[in-house]
């Protein structure tokens, strides 16, 4: 922890998470204003769902490309938790990232509140359960939506892979859009605790808010379990890997594989 605390690059990464999260929330929630969440019996029109989903997905893809080389562009506490459990970042980095993400979301939502105060029924994108959706169902939707997102992040950023092509930020952005297409009509789609937290703070309404922390965190943890221990298990000892939690982020890796079909292993230099 001490080694990261003293590095300018670390604090630049924290600032990058804050700035990118501020832009993400402003752009994405700004696109959704005018649509009242949670939706009622008369659900939002398909074209509205697509517009909002694309805004969330494209903003993540754009900002991931912009700051990915600085902070990794987590922009989501569930993603940060997933990478922590995957032993790719330290506990200190995860904590500072989550704080930066939450503060960025609050700042962005506060700015939006001032700009859009005249909009009728302005919920500032606050997440809540739709009519007829109970807390268990909403929790399940948030778990599944976040699971597929964090699974995509782990797979598209896996440095052991030699078959990766295309754009990882675009793939992750599409995963975010997919999650929204699934969840908008049920929960307004959280799958990002910081984004949900910003709206709850500014509107002073924390109704069912726990769902939008517990669901994404469970989904993120399940994604790590599935990817790191079932789909693409790592051969290195787990007790060695968890040293990253206190020593700092792993930045360089040795790739050990005979061919593209062999299982490869990530080993910190």
Curated annotation (Swiss-Prot):
A motif (NPA 1) lies at residues 76-78. Keywords: Cell membrane, Glycoprotein, Membrane, Phosphoprotein, Repeat, Transmembrane, Transmembrane helix, Transport. Residues 30-46, 110-133, 182-186, 200-206 are extracellular. Glycans are attached at residues 42, 205. Pfam families: MIP. It catalyses: H2O(in) = H2O(out); nitric oxide(out) = nitric oxide(in); CO2(out) = CO2(in); glycerol(in) = glycerol(out). Belongs to the MIP/aquaporin (TC 1.A.8) family. Homotetramer; each monomer provides an independent water pore. Component of the ankyrin-1 complex in the erythrocyte, composed of ANK1, RHCE, RHAG, SLC4A1, EPB42, GYPA, GYPB and AQP1. Interacts with EPHB2; involved in endolymph production in the inner ear. Identified in a complex with STOM. Interacts (via the N-terminal) with ANK1 (via ANK 1-5 repeats). Interacts (via the C-terminal) with EPB42. This is Aquaporin-1.
